[in-house]
Amino acid sequence: MTMKLQFDHSKKFQLDAIESTVKLFEGQQKFDASFVDFVDGVVPNKLTINENEIFENLKDIQKQNKIPISESFEGMNFSIEMETGTGKTYVYLRTIYELNKKYGFKKFIIVVPSVAIREGTKKNFEITKDDFQILYNKIPIQSTEYSSKNISYIRQFSNSNKIEVMIITRDSFNKDVNIMNTPQDKFYGK
């Protein structure tokens, strides 16, 4: 007999964090899942709003959450900060489903600081997957750990019409960034 964890879907502080992230893209058109960039067969996350609109959304979210308002836009780098043990991993995994539901986003890269955190993230993904499948009507989702030894996975990641989540450590990203941008025979020269 296997033990199944029960998740509380109604913790206000978690829902507030998820909603804040989703609101960053307020005004974004929902991406049509049938659209594919036929030149390369890529299924992208295509933004229909610009950085100025995202910056205005950011300031609204900061005001709503009573945190200091940014004076300038410093790029598309956002963080949700929560205390240890409050469900950060649950929040960002559920945020993936919400961003897909509201905007049709399908490509996500989770960059973690260490191998231990990567392994914990993979385990959390497995533990929560069945629960999220019930909550989000069995939306197809695939999670894979990035490995420079399996560079062809990046092509699969970009071509898939499912929600794709790539989990990578910060060190792998920094070390392998040149590999990602270098033509590879295994990667069909792209």
Predicted feature locations:
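RecA-like P-loop NTPase motor core of helicase/translocase proteins
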Residues: 1-190
